[in-house]
Amino acid sequence: MSEQIQIDTGAFQRRVNKLLSCWKDSSADFEQLNQVDSLLVVMGGQNDDLIYSKTTAIHSWLLGYEFPSTVILFTKDSVTFVTSASKAVHLEPLKRSSTGFNLEILKRSKDEASNRALWDDLVSRIDAQGSKVGCLPKDKPIGKFADEWQSVFEKAQSSKDFKMIDVSASLSAVWATKDDDEIKAIRYASKMSSAVMSGYFENEMSTILDEGKKVTHEQLSERIEGKLDDTKLWKRVKGLEGADLSLADWCYTPIVQSGGEYDLKTSAVSSTKRLQGADGNGGVVIASMGIKYRNYCSNIGRTYLIDPHNSQQKMYAFLHEIQTQLADKHLRAGATCKEIYSKAVEIVRAKDEKLVASFVKNVGFGIGLEFRDSAYVLSAKNNRALQRDMVVNLSVGFQDLDDPNHKGEVYSLLLIDTLRINDNAPATFLTDRVRGTNDMSFFFKDDEEEEEEEERRSPAKPDGKVTPGGKVLRNKNRGAAHDDTAAEKMKLHQKELAKQKQEDGLARFAGEDGEGNASNEKVFKKFESYKRENLLPTKVADLKIMVDHRAQSIILPIYGYAVPFHINTLKNVSKSDEGEYTYLRLNFVTPGQIAGKKEDVPFDDPDATFVRSMSYRSSDSSRFTELFREITELRKSATKREAEEKELADVVEQDKLILTKSRAYTLPEVFPRPAMEGKRVPGDLTIHQNGLRFSSPLRPDQKIDLLFSNMKHLFFQPCDKELIVIVHIHLKSPIMIGKRKAKDIQFYREASDVQFDETGNRKRKYRSGDEDEIELEQEERRRRSQLNKEFKVFAERIAEASEGRVSVDVPYRELGFNGVPFRTNVLLQPTTDCLVHLTDPPFLVITLTDVEIVHLERVQFGLQSFDMVFVFSDFSRAPMHVTSIPTTSLDDVKQWLDSVDICVTEGAVNLNWGAIMKTVNEDPYDFFAEGGWGFLQSGSDDGGSSESESGSEFGSEMDDGQEETDEDSDSGSDFGDSAEDESGSEGFEDESEEGEDWDELERKAARADEKKRRQQGGSDDDEDSGKKGKRR
């Protein structure tokens, strides 16, 4: 374990300097720190009973780890560690990076005399600074090390008259504002907390109540705790890319409460009573949980209403309104904790004075390395001000309200989220916020029970403002409460999704480092011709111009020295003849050139001195001609190699396939796509320990290995209404098959055999009618059914062998619609997680979780088709266009997209997506701050392109914008290989080259016919009109 410890020296440097800077700050937040001459932090042995303390927090903040049995002494210009020799090994690298302060490490040993001398040295250092010593009195170190130091320091304290001052509150202020790394850790923790709450607890709790299982609060809490190790859960969570899940842990044991006994404090525990709420009279379940990542905490709490009374729903909606107002209007940098709580009380008092007594005594606290930072409690007595980039745990609730469903009993409501404080903008939710309290209600009553209950009640005038909703289990429909039409519900849902996208965008790009543009920044590349001088060719002694193909360099003689220049530093070379001399001029890439954007490359030090050009002359014309040819060819080969490397940059080198030693499952006689080199031959697909292997006995030298770790999606497409049955695998990263890279690999078998007409044979002689045709049809149906069964079982075995990495997804043909994703009009079919076309290459696989927003273009009355644009969350990828979708499919497409929680907008014209995405990538945060994707819904009718008349304008629009794309391609505005990202059809590039679509060809044909008709004087009007209206 010790070998794995790596301290972030940069973070240590920044944070020590921040501490020393705050020490010198005279503001009220650092009042105690200003009073002391030195700061002493003592960590004793491991104390499992003490989870959170200022001592462990300062260790985690500075070092990223806890160093037991260690003393840290801070002065205003130095840091001193006293620790064991084994721990000192990990601290030594910090000495090399310490600037602005001195760093010393005193190493303890087993020699008591030398240890005593260390203690005396430390006491003298404290005494030299002054008598006022900052300390953390609430932290009580334990163990032999702590006892030894304590005895030494108590004696010194009596003789030196040291005055101990508690600086806990000041330290809280020092690390209250979080840097980007800390925010990232808390965001990971918050995502995980939200995932457990919504992805597991909701379903588990509702199932327990629905099926009447007898499970206690404590048992359910233990189940929740066990989900931390559930890798399947985390694979489904978006936003955890790059997170090391081994660094996650629970902040506290999850809390579950129900049945009229509720404690809204953070110290509450789950009782041994059973989960209640499904007794027919309703109930309230409160759950709170928090996960920490790299010791940075998060927290989330929710209340679930079971068959709630109308007054309970209204009260929960009011609590949600309180949280929304605090987050959107009052949680800002500069506001004091006291002001926040006062605003919350004002909102409650305005609703009902009596509710103030039931309202919580504080509305949250600062959260981070400590789960509850006592210096930043949002209560009525705390005058500390919030700061930008602080993270708070906002907790609002009502305690012990009268339960209308159970006379004489009470219920409580609680809503907790983790938020980041901004300057002049609403606080950012790091946990998934509650959009509406209707989704937090569960209904178990039958319609008949509800009708009987309504009959018993006195008739009352219905409240038109109450929004129906809630989760209904086992199809127990509450249809009488649903007044909104499907279209209105979709519109409301889309508004919520759009608002969520806007907030997520602001949160995602709020960091000062411009997080979103990191992938587009140009990277300085260092080229090295020769590592040592003795590696230069021996011929350089002749001081002649040389071209070294092996080192990819040109060696030029300059003032008696042989100077190598890497070929990538060369811009161009020219040769000219003047009189009896031949001139060779070499121009190099340098900063500040007035040149094309391809030369706009970064430099290690732009202010250094550069050689811009070199000219040589010689009377040996043939020699310079040969040099010019060699340099030109070397430059061409370097450019070609660079292009190939860029093309294959995303291709991964897979690990070795581990062959299974036992009997392996095999799918025989299948064909691969893309096909391997040579003639098409069938082969066997076999499941091994960590992946699949396709091999053919006819070509033993060729095989395809696919590892489970590189699989992203697994599809099974039956042969119903198709000619082939397919098992299709979409990879995370492309692999090489032969000389082509592929991201989509499929294995198929043809569904129909060649049939022979048996007319005139013996069997036909004794049969009449269509018995043969009927028998053939029945045989084909049996064959298709058998093929479907065989391929489906094999796909399920792949999913089982992958141990949860992939699951089998089947396209829903009934939800399919026609469109043109590349050049051909094909059937596109939704699956659970994707939109796919798998029947013919080029394949299309769009992962829905990667989609940011979908925009429908050319949606206007009178047109027969529309276009669909998928914008991806990774803005560096080009949007994916699917054109010429029949207008008859518009409502079905919108309903499908809405059902998978994708934000949908629509407009009447085609947009210039190259320019739009360039703007987004330049400053994503500014884009979202100015409204984000809202312009697509409100302003798309006004922008950019002319209206279409009969077909898609996308093809012609791309042609018109091609010059701009070429010019801007090197400025960071061009995208990655989006077609390769979305489909593994690289092997079929010859089938999917750019060209005009049918609509464009028809328009050209129509114009040609019109021109011909005019020349002939209108004699063929009728015929031309017929041709013009004809569609393919």
Curated annotation (Swiss-Prot):
It is found in: Nucleus; Chromosome. One of its GO terms (molecular function) is nucleosome binding. InterPro entries: Creatin/AminoP/Spt16_N, Creatinase/aminopeptidase-like, FACT-SPT16_Nlobe, Fact-SPT16_PH, FACT_SPT16_C, FACT_SPT16_M, Pept_M24, PH-like_dom_sf. It holds the Pfam family Rttp106-like_middle. Residues 938-955 have a biased composition (Low complexity). Keywords: Chromosome, Coiled coil, DNA damage, DNA repair, DNA replication, Nucleus, Transcription, Transcription regulation. The keyword Transcription regulation applies. Its main location: nucleus. Residues 455-464, 1001-1012 have a biased composition (Basic and acidic residues). Transmembrane segments: none annotated. Gene3D superfamilies: 2.30.29.150, Creatinase/methionine aminopeptidase superfamily, Creatinase/prolidase N-terminal domain, FACT complex subunit Spt16p/Cdc68p, Pleckstrin-homology domain (PH domain)/Phosphotyrosine-binding domain (PTB). Forms a stable heterodimer with POB3. The SPT16-POB3 dimer weakly associates with multiple molecules of NHP6 to form the FACT complex. Belongs to the peptidase M24 family. SPT16 subfamily. Component of the FACT complex, a general chromatin factor that acts to reorganize nucleosomes. The FACT complex is involved in multiple processes that require DNA as a template such as mRNA elongation, DNA replication and DNA repair. During transcription elongation the FACT complex acts as a histone chaperone that both destabilizes and restores nucleosomal structure. This is FACT complex subunit SPT16. The gene is SPT16.
